[in-house]
């Protein structure tokens, strides 16, 4: 919906529904090639005996997880891992409002390996998967040697199945689950509150040709600052305004998830733009409450109205302040 903030003179775009996953193709593509080359170098000759090959945990939890995994930092070394971590942290701060990531795993899937549906909320508000799987098919896609291996995420509307039930609709897997192919260099960030997993891999038993991914969680949402304004410059303005805003938000109907607002601040200190960088805000449905769309509008418009009215100290250049708001 498009809500007009009359006081600030801005139009604030508020989506009707949250966005629980996002796909970024070509994420650190050159560096991803470097990481893949390290892996290929160590697996090229299966007859070679080398300590670097003896690093995998065969993780099997009956009826839940079956895969090969290893800590990415141990596998790639501190320098390469540091570059990977830097790229992920930069993306996490800018787009997801998160200041840290968990230690990254690297996992390999060959024939019969999979992850059944699960939800792992405590680790962080966003999970991620970065694919190093080869695009080795004739058409340039992945999967010349196997089928399956997609990230699968349950569509949020199916969690309220009867509310959205349509007796005239045929419901098949694509209406229940979102499946995302492990294309090389593809970063998938998603809301781990939704049941998710990895579809079973069929085909190759050769780890050189299996599903290879890096994965972990973005965590620790907190404000970030870039440009002329520092945290110390902006904190006095933010502390007063956010205290009042939080007091109003607790009076609104309950919701779960997070939204993150990126503010563009002009050199004179005025806020000139607000962009929602991520949004998983999901109202808690109760019969006596307004519609979920109305609740989302109320919460996000309240946030936007408060932020667009802010006036920061003047500086000699533009700034961007990214503010996450978490609801439980």
Residue ranges and their predicted role:
Residues 2-92, 231-240, 244, 256, ...:
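Non-heme Fe(II)/2-oxoglutarate
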Residues 9-11, 114-119, 176-177, 201-203:
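Catalytic micro-motifs at enzyme active sites that drive phosphoryl/nucleotidyl and oxygen chemistry
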Residues 20, 102, 113, 124-128, ...:
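Residues that flank catalytic or metal-binding motifs in active/ligand-binding sites
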Residues 28-30, 111-113, 122, 133-137, ...:
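Short, solvent-exposed loop/turn segments at secondary-structure junctions
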Residues 57-113, 117-123, 132-141, 299:
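Signature of the catalytic double-stranded beta-helix
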Residues 127-132, 326:
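A contiguous pocket-lining binding segment that forms or flanks enzyme active sites
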Residues 135-183, 200:
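A short beta-strand-loop-beta hairpin characteristic of the jelly-roll/cupin
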Residues 168-177, 184-328:
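Charge-biased low-complexity segments
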């Amino acid at each position: 919906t498009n809500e007009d903030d009359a006081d600030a003179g801005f139009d604030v775009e508020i989506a009707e529904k949250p966005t629980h996953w996002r796909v970024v193709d070509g994420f650190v593509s050159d560096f991803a090639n470097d990481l893949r080359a390290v892996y290929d170098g160590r697996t090229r000759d299966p007859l070679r005996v080398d300590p670097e090959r003896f690093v995998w945990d065969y993780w099997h939890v009956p009826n839940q997880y079956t895969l090969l995994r290893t800590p990415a930092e141990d596998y790639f070394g501190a320098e390469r891992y540091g570059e990977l971590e830097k790229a992920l942290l930069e993306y996490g701060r800018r787009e997801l409002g998160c200041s840290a990531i968990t230690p990254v795993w690297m996992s390999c899937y060959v024939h019969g390996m999979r992850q059944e549906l699960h939800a792992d909320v405590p680790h962080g508000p966003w999970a991620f998967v970065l694919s190093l799987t080869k695009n080795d098919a004739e058409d340039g896609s992945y999967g010349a040697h196997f089928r399956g291996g997609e990230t699968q995420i349950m569509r949020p509307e199916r969690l309220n199945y009867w509310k959205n039930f349509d007796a005239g609709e045929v419901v098949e897997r694509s209406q229940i689950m979102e499946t995302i192919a492990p294309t090389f260099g593809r970063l998938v960030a998603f809301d781990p509150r939704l049941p998710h997993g990895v579809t079973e891999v069929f085909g190759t038993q050769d780890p050189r040709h299996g599903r290879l991914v890096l994965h972990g969680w973005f965590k620790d949402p907190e404000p970030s600052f870039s440009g002329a304004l520092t945290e110390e410059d902006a904190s006095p303005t933010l502390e007063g305004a956010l205290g009042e805003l939080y007091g109003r938000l607790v009076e609104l109907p309950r919701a779960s998830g997070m939204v993150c607002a990126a503010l563009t601040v002009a050199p004179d200190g005025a806020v000139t733009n607000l962009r929602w960088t991520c949004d998983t805000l999901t109202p808690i449905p109760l019969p006596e409450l307004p519609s979920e769309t109305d609740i989302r509008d109320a919460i996000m418009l309240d946030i936007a109205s408060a932020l667009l009215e802010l006036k920061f100290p003047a500086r000699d250049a533009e700034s961007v302040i990214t503010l996450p708001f978490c609801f439980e």
